[in-house]
Curated annotation (Swiss-Prot):
Naturally occurring in which organism (per UniProt): Homo sapiens
PROSITE patterns linked to this entry: DEAD_ATP_HELICASE, HELICASE_ATP_BIND_1, HELICASE_CTER, Q_MOTIF
Region entry SMN interacting, spans: 456-548
GO BP, sorted A to Z: negative regulation of cell population proliferation; negative regulation of transcription by RNA polymerase II; oogenesis; positive regulation of apoptotic process; regulation of steroid biosynthetic process; RNA processing; spliceosomal snRNP assembly; spliceosomal tri-snRNP complex assembly
Protein name: Probable ATP-dependent RNA helicase DDX20
Modified residues (Phosphoserine): 48, 187, 268-269, 500, 505, 532, 560, 652, 654, 656, 672, 677-678, 703, 714
Gene encoding the protein: DDX20
Any one Gene Ontology molecular-function term assigned to this protein's record: ATP binding
Chain intervals for the UniProt region annotation (Disordered): 488-520, 535-559, 642-745
Length: 824
């Protein structure tokens, strides 16, 4: 299956990349003179040899000069590839230039974008720098495409300023562009926002255009935003509404926005394109949705392997299913991209650029690209799911057969409900829907490679220069000649040792002096040109003649022939999956870089305004934004003499170190906990030791003063006892003067009252106690840091090298403290 797809990809001039071991070979002779270079032609170029239908051809030939357009617009149309107008262009452009309100309906891909672009450019006053024309589109991709068409046609108009305003871009950039903008193209949401912020002045708008008007004015879609924008525009303006489909209710509703509108409707009873063959395939229905998806995917792979095509669009009704299908096709050897509404703006624009520049063969999409997207190389459209309405179906299949060309559409539907829905759509649109033949014949696609395309592989910005342009025939000849020369050269070396040198070996030695530099396929973009079937047949004949003519007495052995036959399939162009075009460089991130990347994704990746109110930077620094209801707490370390004596015993030193490490993490990593409950703080300061260990979480053991007899082991512990006794006495005095509040009440009050009352009591009753208590344990923490700073313990340095371990330790400490706090 994949091999057949690769063969069709070679016919459709897919961008291919060959491994380095097959490219870096010895060249025996100079290359022959290359043939004429084919020119890339656009879909609207009627002079190309592509087949055209009556959708774009006129009974009597006409040109744009007969429309009395300005000279810069005529030159721009010619430069953009528009040589002769289509029927809708010939009828609508003169009416629009007269200032009439128009409702234009024509088939997909017949030049409707060129209609309003030409009208807009011809009515523009370049000396007036204010915004004169406003164009709205339902999706960002359509807005970007309209902007590209206007700039292409207006290339000869000096000083033209046309900008696109869509979501996902900074408002500051839009504000700067609107200072000098003749034509504003955008989505309804962003345009409304710009008007509300007074960045866009609607009073200067003279022409208001709705592209895909049926979608913009659909109830529950953009109707409220369109009404708001329309009400802010001046009354004396011209309005154009353009679309391929118009439901009956919408045609009547549009008259409310316009003054005596003129209808330009071509083939309203037959909206399907003449050059499109429409097929459907009924698949088995299963209770589980993933079983249906698997069967449709298998049929899709079979379709790709049997039908040669230039590019294909596959539509799905679900976002998740589209991404999953793209992954499956890429893993099977079919290069596929995905685009959907849940992707960010950069990813969506990148996928569209790859489709239009022929950097991907298959694009899996939702209905995001079903309207207005113009990719002239697409000649196959597949509906993996039946669309929900007939308008969506007509817009989907309109992505193929652009500007009167030929194309093919296939719709997969399950037996039962989906099949009945597809039949209703066919009856509503009056289309000739045929069942897909089984097996699929090879000649189902009438037009596959009978027009010229130029394909370029995606080149990375950090890549190296690409390989020179070489046709497929020359590459095969190079590979064969190289294998023959290598074989002859090996025989020559063997014969030279036996003092028998043949003429062929001498010739091969002279020819092997030229070498091709080694380049991998990831560093090179190999450019291929499409050839006609006749040329491919000539190539095969020339290959066979070359095989018969280059055989020498040295190469008559069966081993050499077998080697050439085995090397040929490997040397043929392969179609790698899309991931092979991307260079994945190994890179190790630190914990700080991971945190920075995560915060960048949270703030910008989701396209939502997100403000980070708390930054955790370590055990000694907790930075909080005071504007969000918190207080910026930062431990200010002061130099205090070390209280612990160096003559402490090993057991007491270990106890003090373990206690100090726990307390330092509590006082610095979770300072709010130490200040949260006055009762718990009193109990922690008055706790008695158990088994020669001290713990802040232990409840009081009956008395408020600790037993001094258990602390006679070292002077450091005596100092600790005196500090704790003084702290408890001051706490008793403060408790007699102030009303006592229970910890349970502090936890159950409202958040603001709890925060202010709790901190007011702490400041009044424990200011001195907490200061001495904090200074004491800060000295222990400083001593612990100074001790390990001078040590060369590998575990400590590993902990410093991997701060994620320390972060996990502190987070776990806070979590345990909160659990114990709630239990108390």
């Amino acid at each position: 299956m994949a091999a057949a797809f690769e063969a069709s990809g070679a016919l459709a001039a897919v961008a291919t990349a060959m491994p380095a071991e097959h490219v870096a070979v010895q060249v025996p002779a100079p290359e022959p003179t290359p043939g004429p270079v084919r020119i890339l032609r656009t879909a609207q170029d009627l002079s190309s040899p592509r087949t055209r239908t009556g959708d774009v051809l006129l009974a009597e030939p006409a040109d744009f000069e007969s429309l009395l357009l300005s000279r810069p617009v005529l030159e721009g149309l010619r430069a953009a590839g528009f040589e002769r107008p289509s029927p809708v262009q010939l009828k609508a452009i003169p009416l629009g230039r007269c200032g009439l309100d128009l409702i234009v309906q024509a088939k997909s891909g017949t030049g409707k974008t060129c209609v309003f672009s030409t009208i807009a450019l011809d009515s523009l006053v370049l000396e007036n720098l204010s915004t004169q024309i406003l164009i709205l589109a339902p999706t960002r991709e359509i807005a970007v495409q309209i902007h590209s068409v206007i700039t292409a046609i207006g290339i000869k108009m000096e000083g033209l300023e046309c900008h696109v305003f869509i979501g996902g871009t900074p408002l500051s950039q839009d504000k700067t562009r609107l200072k000098k903008c003749h034509i504003a193209v955008g989505s309804p949401g962003r345009i409304k926002q710009l008007i509300e912020l007074d960045y866009l002045n609607p009073g200067s708008i003279r022409l208001f255009i709705l592209d895909e008007a049926d979608k913009l004015l659909e109830e529950g879609s953009f109707q409220e935003q369109i009404n708001w924008i329309y009400s802010s525009l001046p009354a004396s303006k011209q309005m154009l509404a353009v679309s391929a489909t118009y439901p009956e209710f919408l045609a009547n509703a549009l008259t409310k926005y316009m003054r005596d509108p003129t209808f330009v409707r071509l083939n309203s009873s037959d909206p399907s394109l003449i050059g499109l063959k429409q097929y459907y395939k009924v698949v088995n229905s299963y209770p589980l949705a993933h079983k249906v998806f698997e069967e449709k995917t298998q049929h899709l792979q079979e379709l790709f392997s049997r039908i040669p095509f230039n590019q294909a669009l596959v539509f799905s009704n679900l976002h998740s299913r589209a991404q999953h299908l793209a992954d499956i096709l890429s893993s099977k050897g079919f290069p596929a991209e995905c685009i959907s509404g849940n992707m960010n703006q950069n990813q969506r624009l990148d996928a569209m650029a790859k489709l239009k520049h022929f950097h991907c063969r298959v694009l899996i999409s939702t209905d995001l690209t079903s309207r207005g997207i113009d990719a002239e190389k697409v000649n196959l459209v597949v509906n993996l799911d039946v669309p929900l309405d007939w308008e969506t179906y007509m817009h989907r299949i309109g992505r193929a057969g652009r500007f009167g060309t030929l194309g093919l559409t296939v719709t997969y539907c399950c037996r039962g409900e989906e099949e009945n829905m597809m039949m209703r759509i066919a009856q509503k649109c009056n289309i000739n829907l045929l069942p897909l033949p089984d097996p699929i014949p090879s000649g189902l696609m009438e037009e596959c490679v009978d027009w010229d395309v130029e394909v370029k592989a995606a080149v990375h910005t950090y890549g190296i220069a690409s390989v020179p342009n070489q046709p497929l025939k020359k590459q095969i000849q190079k590979i064969e000649r190289t294998l023959q020369i290598q074989k002859a050269h090996g025989d020559h070396m063997a014969s030279s040792r036996n003092n028998s040198v043949s003429g062929l070996s001498v010739k091969s030695k002279n020819n092997t002096k030229q070498k091709l530099p080694v380049k991998s396929h990831s560093e090179c973009g190999i450019i291929e040109k499409a050839t006609s079937p006749k040329e491919l047949g000539c190539d095969r004949q020339s290959e066979e003649q070359m095989k018969n003519s280059v055989q020498t007495p040295v190469e008559n052995s069966t081993n050499s022939q077998h080697q050439v036959k085995e090397a040929l399939p490997v040397s043929l162009p392969q179609i790698p999956c899309l991931s092979s075009f991307k260079i994945h460089q190994p890179y190790t991130l630190t914990f700080a870089e991971l945190v920075e990347d995560y915060e960048h994704y949270i703030k910008e990746g989701l396209e939502k305004p997100v403000e980070i109110i708390r930054h955790y930077t370590g055990p000694g620094d907790q930075t909080v934004n005071p504007q969000n209801g918190f207080v910026r707490n930062k431990v200010i370390e002061q130099r205090v003499p070390v209280l612990a004596s160096s003559s402490q015993s090993g057991d007491s030193e270990s106890d003090s170190d373990s206690y100090s490490s726990r307390t330092s993490s509590q006082s610095k990593g979770n300072k709010s906990y130490l200040e949260g409950s006055s009762d718990n703080q009193l109990k922690d300061s008055e706790s008695t030791p158990v088994d020669d260990r001290i713990s802040l979480e232990q409840p009081p053991n009956g008395s408020d003063t600790p037993n001094p007899e258990k602390y006679q082991e070292s002077p450091g512990i005596q100092m600790k006892t005196r500090l704790k006794e003084g702290a408890s006495q001051r706490a008793k005095q403060s408790r007699r003067n102030l009303p006592r509040r229970s910890s349970f009440r502090l936890q159950t009050e409202a958040q603001e009252d709890d925060w202010y009352d709790c901190h007011r009591e702490i400041r009044l009753s424990f200011s001195d106690t907490y200061q001495d208590y904090e200074e004491y344990w800060r000295a222990y923490y400083r001593a612990w840091q100074e001790y390990y700073a001078a040590a060369s313990h590998s575990y400590y340095w590993n902990a410093q090298r991997h701060p994620s371990w320390m972060a996990a330790y502190h987070m776990n400490t806070i979590y345990l403290q909160e659990m114990m706090h709630s239990n108390q």
